[in-house]
């Protein structure tokens, strides 16, 4: 019987597997940030250990950095301590750090791919749940906890059990204006926020192949939001064209050899998946979440569902609780709902393609009265490229705030956050209660939909603005 891409990647990295024991995997890349690493480095220090492979370990500051200044003190005392600890730890243990003043600094899941640290066939870990992003390149990438961060720093290995496999095929062509964010939200709407639990998901089908690498990263980034361990897209010419010439990508003859190997990284035709889900891309409309998990999502032109319409009692109770928290009524359309803030950024949607899509809607328009809209590029290189293209001027002229790179309003760990009761159209990945600030209300959308909300003051069907 044939093997899935996940099975091939897993088996290629097994270092040791004894009967009735969890396999030990080799880790090719370890990405580190300021929040989940301090205790891990302290553990090394306490035991007198070194980082086993500093050349395969890369660090940046992203979660609690200010997006308005490069002052390490700007986000408060705890943030300052975490960033100073990262500086100290990377210097002591010989780890490459992209600090606040480095031109490549940015969100860890943006800088890895754009520097070519992320390559097909790798195992990649980070103390961050959205490490699944890197699976867009055909790499097995997943988030780990702080104790596991220490284990990888010390040994370059990690114990991992085998996951079940899920194939999600999106057939046909996506309509004009439908983005990877709409596709993945539609998928999660179908599977539910726990539909992928215990699985590694492989995304495939004509609509997936048509996506850029930025789009595929958005897709895999949110695999975790359906409960999956990781998300994968098999590498192809789109992948290779994106990677060629990047700093850490192979060069010359090594490049040719790498591509030859990367072309083998796909599921066999006769591979068996534990679960298969199929969607028709032609049926996907712009998506907006209405509740407090990413699976509580509808098309922008649909009505908010009545909790009584859910047959499952847990879903019914969850929907009722979500509507109360979000201060929404069943039966209304989100196009009638006003917003207070707009956030365009995060490891889901802060790449150059995302900013271009938002700028296309913002151009020649103005942010609605009473709305604060911020645009946060995912890295220094993204910011530089956007400014070379004049996107910053488009946003600023429209009334958006143009910020410095960082995780920003995706999570309330810095100065960018919602006040209680504020409603936000956000391009991030989680709409949990309090995620963007205590009692804040988050609606997940694509960058174009976020820009449309900014200029209309409410959720709007971006297809009507184009």
UniProtKB/Swiss-Prot annotation:
Binds 1 [4Fe-4S] cluster per subunit. It holds the Pfam family Aconitase. The keyword Nucleotidyltransferase does not apply. This is 3-isopropylmalate dehydratase large subunit. Heterodimer of LeuC and LeuD. One of its GO terms (biological process) is L-leucine biosynthetic process. Catalyzes the isomerization between 2-isopropylmalate and 3-isopropylmalate, via the formation of 2-isopropylmaleate. InterPro entries: 3-IsopropMal_deHydase_lsu, Acnase/IPM_dHydase_lsu_aba_1/3, Acoase/IPM_deHydtase_lsu_aba, Aconitase_4Fe-4S_BS, Aconitase_4Fe-4S_dom, IPM_dehydratase_rel_enz, IPMI_cat. Its cofactor is [4Fe-4S] cluster. It comes from Pectobacterium carotovorum subsp. carotovorum (strain PC1). Its EC number is 4.2.1.33. It catalyses: (2R,3S)-3-isopropylmalate = (2S)-2-isopropylmalate. HAMAP family: LeuC_type1. Pathway: Amino-acid biosynthesis; L-leucine biosynthesis; L-leucine from 3-methyl-2-oxobutanoate: step 2/4. [4Fe-4S] cluster binds at residues 347, 407, 410. Belongs to the aconitase/IPM isomerase family. LeuC type 1 subfamily. The keyword Nucleus does not apply. Keywords: 4Fe-4S, Amino-acid biosynthesis, Branched-chain amino acid biosynthesis, Iron, Iron-sulfur, Leucine biosynthesis, Lyase, Metal-binding. One of its GO terms (molecular function) is 3-isopropylmalate dehydratase activity. Signal peptide: none annotated. It comes from the Bacteria.
């Amino acid at each position: 019987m044939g093997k899935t891409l996940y099975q091939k990647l897993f088996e290629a990295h097994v270092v040791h597997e004894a009967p009735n024991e969890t396999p030990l995997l080799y880790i090719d890349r370890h990405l580190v940030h300021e929040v989940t690493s301090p205790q891990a480095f302290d553990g090394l220090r306490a035991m007198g250990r070194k980082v086993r492979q500093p050349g395969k370990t890369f660090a940046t500051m992203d979660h609690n950095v200010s997006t308005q200044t490069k002052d390490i003190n700007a986000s408060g005392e705890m943030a300052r301590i975490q960033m100073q600890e990262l500086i100290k730890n990377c210097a002591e243990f010989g780890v490459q750090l992209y600090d606040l003043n480095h031109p490549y600094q940015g969100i860890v899941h943006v800088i890895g791919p754009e520097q070519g640290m992320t390559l097909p066939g790798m195992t990649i870990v980070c103390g961050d749940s959205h490490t699944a992003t890197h699976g867009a390149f055909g790499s097995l990438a997943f988030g780990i906890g702080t104790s596991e961060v220490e284990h990888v720093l010390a040994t370059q290995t990690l114990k991992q059990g085998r996951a079940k496999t899920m194939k999600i095929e999106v057939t046909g062509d996506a309509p004009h204006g439908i983005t990877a964010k709409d596709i993945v939200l539609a998928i999660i709407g179908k599977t539910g926020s726990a539909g992928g639990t215990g699985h590694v998901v492989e995304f495939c089908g004509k609509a997936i192949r048509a996506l850029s690498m930025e789009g595929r990263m958005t897709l895999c980034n949110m695999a975790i939001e359906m409960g999956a361990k990781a998300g994968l897209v098999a590498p192809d010419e789109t992948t290779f064209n994106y990677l060629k010439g990047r700093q850490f990508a192979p060069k010359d003859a090594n490049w040719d050899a790498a591509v030859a190997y990367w072309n083998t990284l796909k599921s066999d035709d006769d591979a068996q998946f534990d679960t298969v889900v199929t969607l028709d891309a032609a049926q996907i409309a712009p998506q907006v979440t209405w509740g407090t998990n990413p699976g509580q999502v509808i098309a922008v032109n649909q009505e908010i569902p009545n909790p009584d319409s859910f047959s499952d009692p847990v879903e019914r109770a969850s929907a009722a609780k979500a509507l109360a928290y979000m201060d929404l009524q069943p039966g209304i359309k989100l196009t009638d709902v006003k917003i207070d803030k707009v956030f365009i950024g995060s490891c889901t949607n802060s790449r150059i393609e995302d900013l271009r899509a938002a700028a296309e809607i913002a151009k020649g328009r103005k942010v609605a009265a009473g709305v604060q809209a911020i645009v946060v590029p995912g890295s220094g290189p993204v910011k530089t490229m956007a400014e070379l293209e004049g996107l910053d001027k488009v946003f600023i002229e429209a009334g958006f705030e143009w910020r410095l790179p960082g995780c920003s309003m995706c999570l309330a760990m810095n100065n960018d956050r919602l006040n209680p009761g504020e409603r936000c159209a956000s391009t991030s990945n989680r709409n949990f209660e309090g995620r963007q600030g205590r009692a804040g209300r988050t609606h997940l959308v694509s960058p174009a939909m976020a820009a449309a909300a900014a200029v209309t003051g409410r959720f709007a069907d971006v297809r009507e603005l184009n």
